[in-house]
Every structure is written in C-alpha cells, then in structure tokens.
C-alpha cells in the first residue's frame, strides 16, 4: 500500500504589529537594545504567539508563555557507517538510545536541569530496543541504505515519516505544549547531513564535511570521497527537498523535518539544536519557507559547515559553546535564555510604571 504525499499548511507570522511589540520592548526600564539578542528573541516569540491569540491587533497585550516544553530526540542508523566514516560502529546508536531511556546521557541531565520533558523516538535503528520503557516506536526500517550505493530510502518512506512526525506533534499540541526542541542520535548522521547540505546549498563537499565526533584525517578523506560518490550517484534524482531526503537522508532526519513542519503548522515554537537538526531545518525551509518564522536556533556547533548553514538560513544562534555531541544538548541549554526573553517581556516594568525618565 503506497503512502500518500503529506503536505503542510504553514501560515507566516504577521509582522504588521512589530512597531507595537518593539515599542513595548523599548519602553522597559533599560536603554533600547541593552538586552541584546534576548530582545530580538522576544520579538520573534511575540510575533508567533500574538498571531495565534485573540489579540493579534494588540500584540503588546499578549502575555508570552512557554508551556510544557518538550525535547524530542530522534534516532536512526545509517548504511554508510559500514564503510568506516565514524569513530563508532552502528551498535552505539542502540546503546545510546538505551542510555537515554535509562536517564544517563547528557541530554537527560540537561533536560532535568532546565525543565524539558524528554521523549526518545526510534525512527529506524538497526536493532530495536525491546523491554525498555520510554522509547517511542516510529520505525521506518532497520537503518538506511548506504547512500553512496543506493538511495537512503524510498520517496514514499519520506511521506510515511512525515505522517508519523505529524501525529507525534499533534499529540503534544493537544496536551498544551507550545515549544518543541529537536535532538538526534545516529552514528553516521553527520555524513547524511553534510550530503543534504551540499545538495541543497550547491556547495563543494569539502565545505560541508567535518570530523563529526572526532574522526582522524584518513577517515575524513574516506567520508569526503563517499559523500562525493553519493552526490554523483543521485545527481539526476535530486529534484526537490523530499528527493534529497530520500536519496541522502536518515530516518531521524526525515522525522525531524516533518516534526518541524508540523509544529510550525500548529504555531508552536521550534528550537533547533546543532548540525544535524539544522540540516533538517534546511530541508523544512525548502519545503515550506514560512517554517523559518517559528525556528529558534539554539547554538553554533563545532562541526564544520554548521556556520555556513546558519548563515544560509539567516540565523543567529543563541549560544556558541564548541559543542559537537548532538542529542539536543545545545537546544536544552538554550531553554533558560528563551524563558528569560519571555520573562523580561512579561515582567519588566516600563519607564512610566517605575516612575523613571525614559532614555529612549
């Protein structure tokens, strides 16, 4: 039975009321712009939440909220790993998924610290984890095809992944969640992300490929060669963003892309983690450009090419910590900054409230 094509209807946020929102920000008891990037973040959040409220014509009266923030970590394996493009074998994906379920990974620690609910989704690791609670089964297969030899997956598998992702987001939306963050786990997924980046941005592979979690120079050369072979093999088939995912992507990247689109469709804020999640965002923006309005980019990772992708998406990340772990760790660490933007917008006094002469 074939999977029907999945489409998303994403409304752009309205910028018509930006002057009123900006005025509210500027009249807080501080010099204009003194809170730096927190101010532009508050403006973005106010655009999204005023558009989705009954006060779209009076956005300055909208009380900003972060409700039930949820971290979704998507896991999948990659056929290209058999060629030795990573320091770790594919089995580590499964072992780390178990670690997530048992609460022992960095993402677990950070989510507990900042107040994220964490869900782990098996999108297609080689061997499913059985008998362990807390892992959501949304498997599209047992690892992707090796992209230098064959497509990662069929085009209809992409739509199946999008449909699963939409259902996942709908469940959280119905529970009242209005902010979702995206992380991933998949040995070899920097290869898939770099291939996606090269295909969409029309860049040389060498400008997109990095050392992942720390490969040596010999392995890096092999990684470069295999991705170049993949792009050459699929050149004629790369006719659009979905075909890029089908030829070059990963099951976890497909479902991240679909979940970003579904969350934006529901006017939820979307926090994008590092290199892999940004590759998913890159595809999502190609499918539905309006999704960009809802994306908050958490950090610039230490992975080669991430800065280029962020610049292409006109994104200014909140953090730059030299992270190269993935899992959603950077997105988790960004949540307190997002909450700080909401809190100053809602709670700071204006000059008139405080009886202070304005410095605007």
Swiss-Prot record:
Entry's EC annotation: 2.4.2.21
A Pfam entry, by short name: DBI_PRT
Stored Gene3D superfamilies: 1.10.1610.10, 3.40.50.10210
Catalysed reactions, as listed in the record: 5,6-dimethylbenzimidazole + nicotinate beta-D-ribonucleotide = alpha-ribazole 5'-phosphate + nicotinate + H(+)
InterPro entries in UniProt: Nict_dMeBzImd_PRibTrfase (IPR003200), Nict_dMeBzImd_PRibTrfase_bact (IPR017846), Nict_dMeBzImd_PRibTrfase_N (IPR023195), Nict_dMeBzImd_PRibTrfase_sf (IPR036087)
Annotated GO MF terms: nicotinate-nucleotide-dimethylbenzimidazole phosphoribosyltransferase activity
Pathway field: Nucleoside biosynthesis; alpha-ribazole biosynthesis; alpha-ribazole from 5,6-dimethylbenzimidazole: step 1/2
Similarity annotation: Belongs to the CobT family.
Function statement: Catalyzes the synthesis of alpha-ribazole-5'-phosphate from nicotinate mononucleotide (NAMN) and 5,6-dimethylbenzimidazole (DMB).
NCBIfam families reported for this sequence: cobT_DBIPRT (TIGR03160), PRK00105.1 (NF000996)
Name listed for the protein in its UniProt record: Nicotinate-nucleotide--dimethylbenzimidazole phosphoribosyltransferase
Organism: Shewanella baltica (strain OS185)
Lineage: Bacteria, Pseudomonadati, Pseudomonadota, Gammaproteobacteria, Alteromonadales
